[in-house]
């Protein structure tokens, strides 16, 4: 029996591109038709004490209009710039992921965190 293809993904729950990439990744895995193991690894984009971004500042609305929203429309993904300000640190959310992964529910947890932040504007910190 062939070894599974292993994919490591470094991701942060406040990165819209990480959420947008989930669908294409799942489709690619189905298309390959091979046994694929996906390992999610935490990568906090702005760890404490570095300040996190604020949606009312110029950068976030600008990048969302130029890149995030067009990509989301192409992929058919419902995503909105969260109003949480400043954006949360995600270290605690990653601790939650570790527990969920140990229970075999890591992928489900990741999807829930992305939905909570990018569709419900919940503070993940």
Predicted regions and their residues:
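Local sequence-structure signature of Cys/Sec-based thiol-disulfide redox active-site neighborhoods
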Residues: 2-25
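Structural alpha/beta surface segment adjacent to cysteine/selenocysteine redox centers
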Residues: 19-122
């Amino acid at each position: 029996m062939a070894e599974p293809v292993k994919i490591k993904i470094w991701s942060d729950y406040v990165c819209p591109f990480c959420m947008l990439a989930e669908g294409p990744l799942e489709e690619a895995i189905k298309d390959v038709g091979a046994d694929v193991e996906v390992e999610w690894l935490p990568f906090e984009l702005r760890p404490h004490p570095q300040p996190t971004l604020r949606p009312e500042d110029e950068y976030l609305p600008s990048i969302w209009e130029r890149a995030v929203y067009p990509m989301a429309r192409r992929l058919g993904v419902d995503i909105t710039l969260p109003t949480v300000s400043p954006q949360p640190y995600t270290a605690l959310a990653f601790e939650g992921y570790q527990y969920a992964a140990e229970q075999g529910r890591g992928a489900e947890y990741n999807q829930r965190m992305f939905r909570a932040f990018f569709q419900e504007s919940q503070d993940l910190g």
